Amino acid sequence: MSAADRFRAAARDRDPARAAAEFADDIRLYNPMSAEPLAGRDAVAAALTGLDEVFDDFEHVQVLTDPDPGDAIAETQAVVFRARVGDHTVEGIDLLEVDHHDRIATFTVFARPLSALQALGQAMAARRPSH
C-alpha cells in the first residue's frame, strides 16, 4: 500500500491528520483557487482540514494509477472525487505524485464547475479568522 493509498483511506475516514502523515515535508499543493502553490506539510495539512470541514458527502469515485511515471516520481494516482459544498456539487481530480521515500510530494487539484468553486472559496474564507 503506497502513501497515496493510505491518503485515500484516511480521506474516506475523514481523518485529515492521518492523511497529512502521508505528505512529504516539502509537499506542494496546486489548487484552482490560487496561482501559487501552498508549500510545506503544515500549510497543506491546514488546507486539507479546512476542506474536510466544508465538504459534505466527500467520496472518491475512481482511481487511475501509473506505477512507473519516471525517475523523479515513484507513483502517480489520479483520484476522481465528488463532494458537496452547500447546494453545489464539486467534481474533480486529485493528482497525487508519490516520491521515492513513499510520501506524497505533489498534490494537484482540478475541480469544476465554477459555481461550486466559488461556493467553496466563500466557505473557506468564512473559516478564516477576521482581523
Pin down the residues of each PLM region.
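C-terminal and inter-domain tail/linker signature
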Residues: 1-131
